A protein has these predicted regions:
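Compact, charge-rich alpha-helical regulatory domains located at protein termini
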Residues: 1-48, 53, 59-65, 69-96
């Protein structure tokens, strides 16, 4: 099942897990992903509680030494470590 926070997706949306270190943008929505160890509803709840809500500003501050995982992301005014696989559930777009 796919869940969107945004009813009007654009072609500018892409997955946070694909972004390089230093990238800045905003959260445009959440989508379900395959292969989670927990139900999608639980993952969605966790991401929302961490601050990955529509319109939140973010920046990738750091990526890990092994396969660039996990990534450190500043979401508004907090810093969060997220696995790249989980970050693929977060749709983002560049700041215009």
């Amino acid at each position: 099942m796919s869940t969107r926070l945004n009813d009007s997706p654009t072609t500018k949306d892409f997955r946070l897990g694909q972004c390089p270190k230093g990238w800045r943008g905003i959260v445009s929505g959440l989508v379900s992903i395959e292969g989670l160890s927990i139900p999608w509803s639980e993952m969605e709840r966790r991401l929302l509680e961490m601050g990955f809500v529509e319109g939140a500003a973010l920046e990738i501050l750091h990526d890990g030494p092994i396969q660039h995982d996990p990534i450190a992301v500043r979401v508004d005014d907090i810093t969060i470590a997220v696995r790249r696989a989980d970050a693929n559930a977060i749709l983002v777009r560049p700041v215009e």
